[in-house]
Curated annotation (Swiss-Prot):
Keywords, alphabetical: Coiled coil, Intermediate filament, Keratin
PROSITE patterns linked: IF_ROD_1 (PS00226), IF_ROD_2 (PS51842)
Family the UniProt entry places it in: Belongs to the intermediate filament family.
Gene responsible for this protein: KRT222
Protein name: Keratin-like protein KRT222
GO molecular function ontology, one term from the record: structural molecule activity
InterPro entries linked to this entry: IF_conserved (IPR018039), IF_Keratin-like (IPR052857), IF_rod_dom (IPR039008), Keratin_I (IPR002957)
Pfam families reported in the protein's UniProt record: Filament (PF00038)
IF rod domain location: 1-150
Amino acid sequence: MELSQLLNEIRANYEKILTRNQIETVLSTRIQLEEDISKKMDKDEEALKAAQAELKEARRQWHHLQVEIESLHAVERGLENSLHASEQHYQMQLQDLETVIEGLEKELQEVRRGIEKQLQEHEMLLNTKMRLEQEIATYRHLLEKEEIRYYGCIQGGKKDKKPTTSRVGFVLPSAIINEISFTTKVPQKYENENVETVTKQAILNGSIVKESTEAHGTIQTEKVDEVIKEWEGSFFKDNPRLRKKSVSLRFDLHLAATDEGCLETKQDNLPDIEVRLIMRRSCSIPSIKPPSTAN
């Protein structure tokens, strides 16, 4: 009895101990599980908060990007409108420039035609000038030959002999300076005078721009001073408005050459002297009347 009772008591204690251990094990396991669950929940909460914060930041950035996109769309629309307006503006300017270019091209063609016409006229004038220069040279050569023939074989000037008078005129186009030469005589008071006067006038558009008069003759040596004074007086007598200071007078004295076929000079007398009086005036001086020519 006592042994079975003791065994029952031991069994009961053991069951109590076993039950207590099981309860403690279960409790410790539950506590551990609760702690693990709590830690996991804390971590999940932190992760959730972080995810919410990240989501919030993402939403904020998305909103900012939406605003920026709308702003960029507005800028794009503004740029498109500006581009369209600029295209229209420059298209109008291009049309205006094309019109101006067409006008300038027409003017250029007209200028080229005018230049070609002027070149043709200039060439014609040059040809005319060259032809007239040849004619002038021919007439000058004829006059020089006539002068050499006249002065080479005649003994001095005689009262009953008068020097020949000739007049040569050239009519050129109005754009070219005309040169008119005419020959006249100077009054003679001495037997041995042989005098001829040549006047040249340069005319531009009907106005005298330059004039020169040249008197040429062979006189006796002892009468040089008197003849020169007489010639000078005759120039200013025909032109009372002409002042002596406004013209340029120059006297050239040369020993007259004696031709073998002409009159021989005497050794006792002084040789005759060739005298040339040259008078020039410019366009700023009053006009000189051309000497009267013999018919």
